[in-house]
């Protein structure tokens, strides 16, 4: 495959809340909940942050790092399940904000937490076919769980943007494979504020089945085994699931080290695997093989066999903040501030 990753950027809001603080309000042992999920804290967007602003921040970093002219972007897709508008695309606002309009195609993608990886696949096809010079794929979410629900301990916010092209490729995409079924593990109807989920049903028949099947199929397709990869990144609805699936597939903790980011920032949904990949690329040198397996409820997985090139040595990683900054920093807030920021307090009226 000629097309690959030319540049990337990530952004995570600065505010954080811990499972302990959430549990304190609901009379639950939040510390035990956090340990069970392997989530120490999660990111919280400020009142003036949403999928549009987060996507724009991530993409601006990617464009400057790669010295890419926004007018050369021929396609821009934003994958999310928390688009600000039901009718009005996120992608057009982001494209306008970075100066990429008007000569491009743009659209919003939805497929739960794998909308971002689906956007990457689409960009790979367009670039590979010679229809566009650069394609931009963004995965961003400002996810929410109902007050007191188990999701509230992990659902967070963040985004990552990847520029796909043929020139100055820093990470080559060797193969991509998908595995998709109709599995109703997680859903939210139009007009419903918070999502519903199948509890334990979200595990074995949903996440684990799709991720393991997709991982096996891509390794079979390219003739690799777990030991051939320097890094592996899985979708991470919490910190526990990716560790478990990695062990089942035969990967080691060192291979998962940089790709596992949820324990520090929570589940960023469409951005989860992509922020993990961005962190891997922050630390990677030339010739390192990477396996990425995303997952989206409903349900499906997209897997990518990647390998960094010599160009990553000269790639301008210093612009913008590395993912590690977001994993280590943050301003902790109380549940009261969190509820205010996320609109969880119903003030009445329209």
PLM region spans:
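Short glycine-rich or small-residue beta-strand-to-loop segments that form or flank ligand, phosphate
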Residues: 74-82, 108, 230-233
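Acidic, glycine-rich active-site loops and adjacent beta-strand->loop/helix elements
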Residues: 10-11, 79-84, 111-116, 139-144, ...
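Buried hydrophobic positions in well-ordered alpha/beta secondary-structure cores of metabolic enzymes
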Residues: 5-7, 33, 62, 76, ...
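Condensing-enzyme catalytic core mediating Claisen C-C bond formation in acyl metabolism
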Residues: 1-48, 149-205, 209, 292-298, ...
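Phosphate/pyrophosphate-binding loops at sites that engage ATP/ADP/AMP, CoA/4′-phosphopantetheine
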Residues: 58-74, 212-228, 249, 284
């Amino acid at each position: 495959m000629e097309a690959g990753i030319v540049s990337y950027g990530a952004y995570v809001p600065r505010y954080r809340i811990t499972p302990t603080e959430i549990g304190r309000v609901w009379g639950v042992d939040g510390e035990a909940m956090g340990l069970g999920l392997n989530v120490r804290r999660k990111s919280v967007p400020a009142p003036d942050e949403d999928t549009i602003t987060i996507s724009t921040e991530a993409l601006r970093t990617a464009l400057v790092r790669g010295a890419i002219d926004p007018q050369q972007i021929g396609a821009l897709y934003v994958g999310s399940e928390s688009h600000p508008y039901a009718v009005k695309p996120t992608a057009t606002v982001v494209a306008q904000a970075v100066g990429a309009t008007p000569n491009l195609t743009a659209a919003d993608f939805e497929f739960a937490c794998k909308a971002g990886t689906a956007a990457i696949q689409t960009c790979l096809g367009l670039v590979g076919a010679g229809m566009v010079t650069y394609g931009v794929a963004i995965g961003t979410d400002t996810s929410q769980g109902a007050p007191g629900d188990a999701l509230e301990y992990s659902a967070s916010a963040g985004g990552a943007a990847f520029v796909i092209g043929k020139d100055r490729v820093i990470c080559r995409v060797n193969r991509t494979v998908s595995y998709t079924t109709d599995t109703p593990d997680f859903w939210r109807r139009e007009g419903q504020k918070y999502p519903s989920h199948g509890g334990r049903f979200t595990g074995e028949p949903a996440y684990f089945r799709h991720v393991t099947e997709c991982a096996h199929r891509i390794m079979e397709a390219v003739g690799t085994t777990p030991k051939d990869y320097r890094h592996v990144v899985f979708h991470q609805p919490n910190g526990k699931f990716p560790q478990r699936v990695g062990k089942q597939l035969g990967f080691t903790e060192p291979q998962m080290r940089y790709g596992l980011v949820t324990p520090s920032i929570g589940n960023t949904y469409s951005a989860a695997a992509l922020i993990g990949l961005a962190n891997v690329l922050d630390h990677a040198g030339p010739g390192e093989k990477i396996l990425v397996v995303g997952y989206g409820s409903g349900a499906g997985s997209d897997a990518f066999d990647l390998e960094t090139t010599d160009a990553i040595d000269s790639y301008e990683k210093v612009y913008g903040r590395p993912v590690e900054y977001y994993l280590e920093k943050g301003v902790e807030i109380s549940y009261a501030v969190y509820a205010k920021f996320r609109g969880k307090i119903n003030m009445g009226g329209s």
